[in-house]
Amino acid sequence: EYDEIYIMIADAQALTDNAENPGKVRDNIIEVALDYLSCGLDPAKSTLFIQSQVPELTELSFYYMNLVTVARLQRNPTVKSEIQMRKFENSIPVGFFTYPISQASDITAFKATTVPVGEDQEPMIEQTREIVRKFNSVYGDTLVEPEILLPDNKACLRLPGIDGKAKMSKSLGNCIYLSDTPEDVRKKVMSMYTDPNHIQVSDPGQVEGNCVFTYLDAFCKEEHFERYLPDYKNLDELKEHYKRGGLGDVKVKKFLNNVLQEELEPIRARRAELEKDIPAIFDILKAGSEKAQAKAAQTLHEVKDAMRINYFDDAELIQKQAEKYSK
């Protein structure tokens, strides 16, 4: 459907709340790249790149900052939620506070028409759209206003962490990682948050807000019941039994574990093969970063041209100044 696909590893953004631990960010770059590639990303069809290796993004952010007020950033629901989650309170790093502007640069630099995100990122995309409209109204049509692309499966809009308290996040340590061993996955699934009032098997259970059922909504298919839980035809039947009582959390968690293990097994196998040639992964990232930089440089050139700050390329400006000072 898309002529070009750019996928960014946001190491510079990660530094906004890891400035004192750059080694952590550095080490995670290869982990993220392995995750993307093991899930099937084809570098021949998509451009995988590292944010910090495209300095044009930083320059674009600097220009966009003049189009956004502090008050507008403070009203961004995603920013407010992230600040609360990280307990920054009155010590918010400036880089973190302004990351919606940085994200606007990440999107507009590649003339993106579509941005696939979870629902929690909708305010960020809307802020990008505002920046695009503001820039174009001041300097003329230059930037592309992107559309948001949400998952068809509503359960995938925002997967909660296994603790049930927030979205799944590496920084919060409530994730199931693609690199986890089968035993790691099993332990995490068996420790998942469910309904705290579902104490005995006979107790009626709550499905809404129950992590286990949220993950089943996201990953479970009818054929899984044939293989792992033949007493039920589909997920609706399982939910109804849980809600009326008589179905224990352990049984449901064991089923989810089987579902996730089946989903993750081919990913783990591909990852194991990719790990055998790490220099090749860096080659992919280098080639992708070079391609991304070329694209971003073109957009930056157009932005500076629209703003009339392309001094050395502006023959008319040079001529006018020459005439002014020759009198």
Q: How would you label these PLM feature ranges?
A:
Residues 1-105, 223, 262-264, 268, ...:
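N-terminal Rossmann-like or analogous alpha/beta NTP/dinucleotide-binding catalytic cores
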Residues 23-30, 122-125, 282:
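Non-membrane alpha-helical structural segments and their capping/turn regions in soluble enzymes
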Residues 54, 69, 75-78, 84, ...:
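Short capping/connector residues at structural and topological boundaries
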Residues 58-62, 99-102, 122-125, 209-213, ...:
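Non-catalytic, well-ordered alpha-helical scaffold segments
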Residues 77-81, 85-135, 139, 160-161:
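Internal, conserved structured core segments that host functional sites
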Residues 129-327:
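Conserved nucleotide- and phosphate/pyrophosphate-binding catalytic cores
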